[in-house]
């Protein structure tokens, strides 16, 4: 069994205009306690329907994102050939720009969103800062398909493979997004 971590390390690299990461150490009764302040879309995160003004409906028990995963490459995807899976991951190669300004300048175009919406996919993830603009988000989220953004470069090792996917967001349900820890088990 092999486990691949698909999560970006939590660093102060917010989308332009989003809240920055701040960690404030406090000493309380001899202990160090850190106060962590950050936006809900910092680094690897999951978007919920509330992100686009919809009521949150989460298609996974207890909010744990798990199931059969499959990864495709944006470059060589053949239209109408979506694999049968619960979680579809899309490798764009944009993750190689992580930590640099150009990462936010590269917005992928996903020409097969209609195919994803017509499928039984419950969650789609990508190694880019976004899966698209407001309309793309709303189309997916209104069809009860959750979105994971900012996956790391390990995604390239999964292209063309099936695996078991496990994503653990914070256990907060009435929120627009949450940081999430994502792994693939091969």
From Swiss-Prot:
<dbReference type="InterPro" id="IPR007325">
    <property type="entry name" value="KFase/CYL"/>
</dbReference>
<dbReference type="InterPro" id="IPR037175">
    <property type="entry name" value="KFase_sf"/>
</dbReference>
<dbReference type="GO" id="GO:0004061">
    <property type="term" value="F:arylformamidase activity"/>
</dbReference>
<protein>
    <recommendedName>
        <fullName>Uncharacterized protein MJ0783</fullName>
    </recommendedName>
</protein>
<dbReference type="GO" id="GO:0019441">
    <property type="term" value="P:L-tryptophan catabolic process to kynurenine"/>
</dbReference>
<dbReference type="Pfam" id="PF04199">
    <property type="entry name" value="Cyclase"/>
</dbReference>
């Amino acid at each position: 069994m092999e486990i691949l971590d698909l999560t970006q390390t939590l660093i102060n690299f917010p989308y332009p205009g989003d809240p920055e990461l701040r960690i404030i150490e406090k000493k309380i009764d001899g202990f160090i306690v850190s106060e962590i302040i950050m936006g809900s879309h910092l680094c690897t995160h999951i978007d919920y329907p509330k992100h686009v003004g919809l009521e949150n409906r989460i298609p996974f028990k207890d909010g744990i994102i798990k199931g059969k995963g499959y990864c495709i490459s944006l470059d060589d995807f053949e239209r109408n050939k979506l694999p049968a899976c619960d979680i579809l991951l899309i490798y764009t190669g944009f993750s190689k720009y992580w930590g640099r300004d150009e990462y936010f300048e590269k917005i992928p175009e996903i020409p097969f969103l209609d195919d994803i919406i017509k499928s039984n996919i419950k969650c789609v993830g990508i190694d880019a800062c976004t899966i698209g603009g407001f309309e793309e988000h709303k189309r997916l989220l209104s069809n009860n398909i959750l979105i994971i953004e900012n996956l790391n470069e390990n995604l390239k090792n999964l292209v063309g493979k099936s695996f078991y996917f496990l994503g653990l967001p914070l256990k907060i349900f009435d929120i627009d997004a949450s940081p999430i820890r994502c792994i693939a088990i091969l």
